[in-house]
Regions:
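Hydrophobic small-molecule pocket/channel-lining residues, especially in calycin-type beta-barrels
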Residues: 79, 151, 155-157
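Hydrophobic beta-strand-centered segment that forms part of the acyl-chain substrate-binding groove
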Residues: 3, 24-27, 94-131, 157-159, ...
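Terminal leader/tail segments of proteins
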Residues: 50, 56-65, 125-133, 158-161, ...
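Segments adjacent to and within acyl-thioester-processing domains across lipid
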Residues: 2-34, 158-183
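Hydrophobic beta-sheet segments that form the core/acyl-binding groove
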Residues: 49, 116-153
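Short coil/turn motifs at secondary-structure junctions
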Residues: 54, 67, 139-141, 153-155, ...
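Catalytic strand-loop segment that frames the active site of acyl-thioester-processing enzymes
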Residues: 40-81
Length: 183
């Protein structure tokens, strides 16, 4: 049975107006992710955001394919995703959540400042789809502590606690050009 009234407005509790209904979780495609994160191929490790509750949690997806450069050397006869890249995927998902809340984000960078309790529980191989869930533990000014987990087909493959900090983006340095040789 539907919870929609005849005039197609959602049912509300007596204390709740339609404007106070919780918003649907936000999603992001790859272009929106790229507008937030400075990472690019081959180091952009989230493909899509499927859920996001501002300042609380984010769920992102990463599709693993044999075409990724790490599989050329890790390991050619048994390709598995390096654990450190899974932790980086957790940090990037958390970074997307954090930077989505930062005003003037083009003038900011997000630095990964710590990793705690990282555990790698199962190998990840080409063909797997990572579901990366990150939840805010503590958000203080520019620093955020987040707990992250990655599952494949509902099975936990990695979890870690990460800390990130927003810092001003330094001005680009223009190196002095060497003088042209004198003839």
């Amino acid at each position: 049975m539907s919870n929609v009234t005849s005039d197609a407005t959602p049912d509300t509790t007596p204390d709740q107006t339609p404007d106070e209904q919780p918003a649907a979780p936000k999603t992001m495609d790859i272009l929106e992710i790229m507008s937030l994160l400075p990472h690019r191929y081959p180091f952009l490790l989230i493909d899509r955001v499927v859920e996001m509750e501002p300042r609380k949690r984010i769920v992102a997806i990463k599709n693993i394919t044999i075409n990724e450069p790490q599989f050329q050397g890790h390991f050619p006869d048994y390709p598995i995703m390096p654990g450190v890249l899974m932790v980086e995927a957790i940090a990037q998902a958390g970074g997307a959540l954090l930077l989505s809340e930062v005003p003037d984000r083009k003038s900011k960078l997000l630095f990964f400042t710590s990793i705690e309790n990282a555990r790698f529980r199962r190998p990840v191989t080409p063909g797997d789809q990572l579901r990366i869930e990150v939840t805010v533990i503590n958000w203080r000014s520019r620093a955020v502590k987040m707990g992250g987990s990655i599952t494949v087909d509902g099975k936990l493959v990695c979890d870690a606690v990460v800390m990130c900090q927003v810092v001003p983006r330094p001005a680009k340095k223009v190196e002095d050009k060497p003088e042209a040789p004198q003839e």
